[in-house]
A protein has these predicted regions:
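Structural beta-sheet core signal
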Residues: 9, 37-39, 103, 126, ...
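Conserved nucleotide-sugar phosphate-binding/catalytic loop shared by glycosyltransferases and other
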Residues: 35-81, 88
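An aromatic- and histidine-rich active-site surface loop
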Residues: 102-119
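Active-site proximal beta-strand in glycosyltransferases
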Residues: 116-130
């Protein structure tokens, strides 16, 4: 068997994992692809239930666990947690050497992965870009991730058009519909 492209999916919470599950299952079953999983963020926080165990219970192997060590919900604590996570993600990428990284959404705890892929020149696919959640920090993070991404998988043509208006190339954007509809396990 020849080289299998290494596809690294980063999951930070039960919410994104439920959407990513069918994609992860498809990659795992593929003869051409090698699934890598990094669990981070809320998955690794005791008060949120250590939900990385759900991934393992679904018979997926987690290649790396990258804690953010967030202490509080203050802005300073979030920034410190993101810095810690950025360092951990860089170490994970140097070990795993992924050919493509896939992230979903707009959470602050996946933003460090997008930054790392950009600096390390690892192609990044972003799922659910182009969306808007007015009045919260999510929009800035989501749009920043979209600007760092090489491939975009959006839920509607409206979101595709928003990415195009932000300067993303039409050929790099695919409307796949909502993974929330597809992903119910």
């Amino acid at each position: 068997m020849g080289y299998k492209n290494k596809i690294c999916i980063i999951s930070s919470s039960r919410a994104d994992y439920n959407h990513l599950y069918p994609l992860m299952l498809g990659i795992k079953k593929s003869k051409e692809l090698d699934l890598q999983i990094i669990a981070t963020g809320m998955h690794l926080i005791r008060k949120h239930g250590m939900t990385y165990k759900e991934i393992e219970n679904d018979n997926f192997f987690i290649d790396c666990k990258v804690p953010s060590k967030q202490k509080t919900t203050s802005a300073n604590s979030l920034v410190e947690a993101m810095a810690t996570e950025l360092k951990g993600i860089a170490v994970a990428f140097s070990q795993l050497k992924p050919d493509l990284v896939i992230i979903l959404g707009d959470r602050y705890d996946i933003f460090p992965a997008a930054i790392a892929t950009h600096i390390l020149q690892i192609p990044l696919a972003h799922i659910h870009g182009g969306e808007v959640t007015s009045g919260v920090i999510d929009d800035g993070i989501r749009h920043s991730i979209s600007k760092l991404a090489n491939l975009h998988f959006v839920a509607t043509n409206e979101f595709k058009n928003r990415l195009i208006s932000m300067g993303e190339e039409n050929k790099s954007i695919v409307n796949i519909g909502s993974l929330a509809v597809q992903g119910n396990k």
